[in-house]
Amino acid sequence: MRKAKPKKRVILPDPVFNDQKVSKFVNHLMYDGKKNTSYEIFYAALETVKAKLPNEEKTALEIWKKALDNVTPQVEVKSRRVGGATFQVPTEIRPDRKESISMKNLILFARKRGGKSMADKLAAEIMDAFNEQGGAFKRKEDMHRMAEANRAFAHFRF
């Protein structure tokens, strides 16, 4: 066990939208400390989203936030061992973990898409998530389905 709980690091807002959520997303997107490249990919993806949805009254940032909300899980299952048997126990997810999972899933499924540049793949995944489709949305639905199937074990609290 550690002595004290580690302090939360302050994440500075991004330069364009002045939003902490964007900075956090870019940090997840980043490889090898190349944050500028990550920002370029993210902003290019938002430009692509705006170009492909011209008649949408929302801004590209609002579309991205809605897409993130659509892929954010509310419950997850955790393994709990009780008397020799392992149960999948559904548990609520902390708000900061919800955000982190949704960002990581969106990026993971964007990377899994074939071909094109990362900006295009990310834009496509954002649009799919906005329309409640795509891999990241399916992952969230699967998590909820697993939790629902194992609802009988919800009384095994952690």
UniProtKB/Swiss-Prot annotation:
Q: Which GO terms describe its molecular function?
A: rRNA binding; structural constituent of ribosome; tRNA binding
The record's annotation in CDD domains points to:
uS7_Bacteria (cd14869)
Q: Which SUPFAM superfamilies does UniProt cross-reference here?
A: Ribosomal protein S7 (SSF47973)
GO BP terms: namely: translation
UniProt keywords (A-Z) are:
Ribonucleoprotein, Ribosomal protein, RNA-binding, rRNA-binding, tRNA-binding
Q: Which Gene3D superfamilies match?
A: Ribosomal protein S7 domain (1.10.455.10)
Gene Ontology CC annotations of this record: small ribosomal subunit
Family per record: Belongs to the universal ribosomal protein uS7 family.
Its subunit composition reads: Part of the 30S ribosomal subunit. Contacts proteins S9 and S11.
Physiological role: One of the primary rRNA binding proteins, it binds directly to 16S rRNA where it nucleates assembly of the head domain of the 30S subunit. Is located at the subunit interface close to the decoding center, probably blocks exit of the E-site tRNA.
Record's protein name = Small ribosomal subunit protein uS7
| Taxonomic source organism | Bacteroides fragilis (strain ATCC 25285 / DSM 2151 / CCUG 4856 / JCM 11019 / LMG 10263 / NCTC 9343 / Onslow / VPI 2553 / EN-2)
Q: State the organism's lineage.
A: Bacteria, Pseudomonadati, Bacteroidota, Bacteroidia, Bacteroidales
